[in-house]
Amino acid sequence: MMSFQKIYSPTQLANAMKLVRQQNGWTQSELAKKIGIKQATISNFENNPDNTTLTTFFKILQSLELSMTLCDAKNASPESTEQQNLEW
C-alpha cells in the first residue's frame, strides 16, 4: 500500500497521481483508454492540474484505485500551515 505526504496544491496532487500511474506501468494513453477520455486530457492534468475539471479529476482518481480524505485545516500544525502557504 502506498502512502503519501499531505498534499497542499493541485501540482502536488497531479504529481502523486502521475507517480501511481507510472508505478502501475500505465502510459497516459492506456489510462485514458481505460476511462474513456483523450490522452491529452491526462497530459493536461499531469502538467497543468489547475485547469482540470472535478469530473475529470475523479475519473482519474477512481481509475487509479485511489481515494481522497479531507482533513480539518483548523487542527493542522503550524508547520503544515506554513508548508501550505508556500505551496500556493
UniProtKB/Swiss-Prot annotation:
Keyword Transcription in annotation = yes
Keyword list, A-Z: DNA-binding, Repressor, Toxin-antitoxin system, Transcription, Transcription regulation
Pfam families linked to this entry:
HTH_3 (PF01381)
One of the entry's Gene Ontology molecular-function terms is: transcription cis-regulatory region binding
User: Knockout consequence?
Assistant: Cannot be disrupted, suggesting it is a functional antitoxin; no visible phenotype when the hipBA operon is deleted. A hipA or a hipB-hipA operon deletion show decreased biofilm production in the absence of antibiotics.
Question: Which cellular component terms (GO) are annotated to the entry?
Answer: protein-DNA complex; toxin-antitoxin complex
Q: Which stretches hold the DNA-binding feature? A: 21-47
Domain HTH cro/C1-type span(s) in chain numbering: 17-71
Post-translational modification as stated in the protein's UniProt record: Degraded by Lon protease in vivo; half-life is 17 minutes in wild-type cells and over 200 minutes in a lon deletion strain. In vitro degradation by Lon is Mg(2+)-ATP-dependent.
Any GO BP:
regulation of growth
Q: How is its activity regulated?
A: Degraded by Lon protease; degradation is inhibited in a HipA-HipB complex and when bound to the operator consensus sequence dsDNA.
- InterPro entries (alphabetical): Cro/C1-type_HTH, Lambda_DNA-bd_dom_sf
Disulfides per UniProt: none
Q: Would the keyword Ubl conjugation turn up in this protein's UniProt record?
A: no
Subunit details: Homodimer. Binds operator DNA sites in the absence of HipA, inducing a 70 degree bend in consecutive operators and deforming DNA between the operators so that HipB dimers bind on opposite faces of the DNA. Forms a HipA(2)HipB(2) heterotetramer which can interact with a single operator site on DNA, inducing a 70 degree bend. When 2 operators are present each HipB dimer contacts 1 HipA molecule, which are brought together by the DNA bend and dimerize, blocking the HipA active site and inactivating its toxic activity.
Q: What does this protein do?
A: Antitoxin component of a type II toxin-antitoxin (TA) system. Neutralizes the toxic effect of cognate toxin HipA. Also neutralizes the toxic effect of non-cognate toxin YjjJ. Binds to operator sites with the consensus sequence 5-'TATCCN(8)GGATA-3' to repress the hipBA operon promoter; binding of HipB(2) to DNA induces a 70 degree bend. This forces HipA dimerization, which blocks HipA's active site and thus its toxic action. May play a role in biofilm formation.
Q: What is this protein called?
A: Antitoxin HipB
What's the source species for this entry?
Escherichia coli (strain K12)
Organism taxonomic ancestry: Bacteria, Pseudomonadati, Pseudomonadota, Gammaproteobacteria, Enterobacterales
Q: Which gene encodes it?
A: hipB
